[in-house]
Amino acid sequence: MIILKKLKILLISWLLLPINVFAYSNYIIPGGETLGIEVNSKGVMVIGFYQINGKFNKGVPVIKAGDYIVKINDVEVNTIEELTKAIEANVSLGEVNVELRRDKKVRTSKLELVKDGDIYKTGLYVKNSITGTGTLTYIDPETKIFGALGHEIVESNTNNIVEVKDGSIFRNYITGIDKSKVGYAGSKNAKFYYNTKYGSINKNTNVGIYGIYDSILPNKERLEVARNDEVKIGKASIATVLSKEDIKYYDIEITKIDEYTKVKNISFKITDKELLDKTGGVVQGMSGSPIIQNGKIIGAVTHVIIDNPTTGYGLFITTMLEEGEK
């Protein structure tokens, strides 16, 4: 009987041991490359409405900006082309049944097809893809999982996070910089090379975009992943592109560390004169730039502070690596 009690205690102690369920590598390939990014939505996004002959479509009270149209008369649609084809096939009916997704719940509505001259209109503004520029944060050389951006991709009209069906990262060439100033976030201006694809996107989250790097891995020195408690106030650097495809390292100063928030763990200010002269501070397109300290990769740039664009936020690299593995 005594032996059984001891065994029970031993089993309980085993269950209490912490288990690391994430399998990311301890050494990863740092990014810094500017990327072209294109994501396609799960369904067709409704982004707004317009009047036809002075009034809105009668289906509009049910349909909201930010909804995803997923079916027309039970036919699945994921692109504007598929949506148009499904509607055109039912023009003679004068209306269609629309299946919508909102907050992961399915809703239905009837949508009148209104004739205006020689064409039929729905009164809906829609889109199914978004393209932009961001920065690669890392590639895990063992799994080929990549992380980039450090924050979510949102649809600009609704400000909603895009529910991604699939997407791509591809070659991007910086042609100039629109400088930041107080009250205004500048941006990287870029040329897109859609035919030079680097990887496939399968996830869009509030801590970055993730997927599989399909191309040949960059020939770079792998950097050790820093634990959160290794990140210190003081000097660090970011890797990013300001011209063409040339990755350079620029000095920053980490001013505050917050371990208890998810997306703004690292507060920093730019101290590099060259970077400040060329950009005025943090600019759009810089999101995802890896942050390096003491030879280790510690995080990624995520946000600019508009009131003082020489300052910004970053998140811990471990947060991105864990999200990439989920």
Where are these regions (language model features)?
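Sec-dependent N-terminal signal peptides of Gram-positive bacterial secreted proteins and lipoproteins
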Residues: 2-23
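PDZ-domain C-terminal substructure recognizer with occasional recognition of PDZ-binding tails
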Residues: 35, 84-123
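Short, Lys/Arg- and Gly-enriched loop/turn segments at beta-strand edges
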Residues: 75-86, 247-249, 307-311
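Serine endopeptidase catalytic core focused on the charge-relay Asp
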Residues: 115-280, 284, 293-294, 302, ...
